[in-house]
Amino acid sequence: MRYFTAGESHGPRLTAIIEGVPAGLSLSAEDINIELKRRQGGYGRGGRMKIESDQVEITSGVRHGKTIGSPITLNVTNRDFKNWEQIMAAQDVEDKIKKQRRLTKPRPGHADLVGGMKYEFEDLRNVLERSSARETTMRVAVGAVAKKLLHELEIEVANHVVNFGRREISSPEHLSVQEIRETAGRSDLSIFDESQAEDLRTYIDQIKKAGDTIGGIIETRVEGVPAGLGSYVQYDRKLDAKIAGAVVSINAFKGVEFGLGFEAGKRPGSQVMDEIIWSENKGYTRSSNQLGGFEGGMTNGEQLIVRGVMKPIPTLYKPLMSIDTESHEPYKASVERSDPTALPAAGVVMENVVATVVAQEICDKFNSDTINELKKALVDYKKRLSEY
């Protein structure tokens, strides 16, 4: 299973093509729209979310509500395109139009300057349009398909925010996906402890009033994953490495950890490793889950615990200094549109990205033409594990 996305932030539409989804999976536009709506929610969101109300159109790979094994094409229309039709036109236009909304003042923390240097662009809008977080719309759309497939296999995924800036959100060590959905899933801050919500909203409002932004830490948990996904045999087959790469590929994510994560580097080994236990009923399990469900690049049958670190949104209403690429004169960086935080929305993106990687790994391991064949292969594999 693999996918590609295409489209610019202010272009006519965003597109994703997914190849390798087994035939026979029930799938509707509404399955995807539910996830897209989640991405557009959350406290601290602003301008663009009022303009866009994302709805997907499935144009291939699904017939009469079922996948048919061919590539699935997903399209999301950019409703704001009507205001950018000439500026973002594919055909050549007059110079005076080209100069409209031209960007020569790169924003610190964005791809603007380096992208312009790499591709020899005079107008940095060519970089901004593709590097924008708007692209994550299609990462979520793809993830919605992956989550539908995982649900059929009794694998579930959820996320919650564990830090807003320096504000840590309290949550229990043992936390099920269902508990996350029943708490963080109903919170506009995506937090487990709603008693901290009002203080956090005040904090976010203060950040916004100051013209600043904040980042934080998001945790995604996956349940129902069997032991043995991924491999220790080669570096590029380790599933935790694949997930880490996918998470830091999300706009503004700068780090990832599993289980204890970086805390493991501060503890002695006896306080980090998960002891192995066995019972006739459950087979091999662990007494704890400090390693976040991974050993040797493989899933060990425990819940997957993945955390991603999101930097503050780099577009600031109190802009930092930059250099005009045309005149080389100092200038205050441009403001396109910005929110004080996008952590709740970023959590939805991370959740769907992690789901996609897990679904890809399952489809690769149990290469199946149909969803029924895939289900049977997974059942047979679990049976083999239980007999070890």
UniProtKB/Swiss-Prot annotation:
GO terms for biological process: amino acid biosynthetic process; aromatic amino acid family biosynthetic process; chorismate biosynthetic process. Pathway: Metabolic intermediate biosynthesis; chorismate biosynthesis; chorismate from D-erythrose 4-phosphate and phosphoenolpyruvate: step 7/7. PROSITE patterns: CHORISMATE_SYNTHASE_1, CHORISMATE_SYNTHASE_2, CHORISMATE_SYNTHASE_3. One of its GO terms (molecular function) is FMN binding. GO terms for cellular component: cytosol. It catalyses: 5-O-(1-carboxyvinyl)-3-phosphoshikimate = chorismate + phosphate. Keywords: Amino-acid biosynthesis, Aromatic amino acid biosynthesis, FAD, Flavoprotein, FMN, Lyase, NADP. Reduced FMN (FMNH(2)). It is an enzyme of class 4 (lyase). NADP(+) binds at residues 39, 45. Its cofactor is FMNH2. InterPro entries: Chorismate_synth, Chorismate_synth_AroC_sf, Chorismate_synthase_CS. FMN binds at residues 130-132, 251-252, 296, 311-315, 337. Its EC number is 4.2.3.5. This reaction introduces a second double bond into the aromatic ring system. Homotetramer. Belongs to the chorismate synthase family. PANTHER family: CHORISMATE SYNTHASE (PTHR21085:SF0). This is Chorismate synthase. It comes from Lactococcus lactis subsp. cremoris (strain SK11). The lineage of its organism: Bacteria, Bacillati, Bacillota, Bacilli, Lactobacillales.
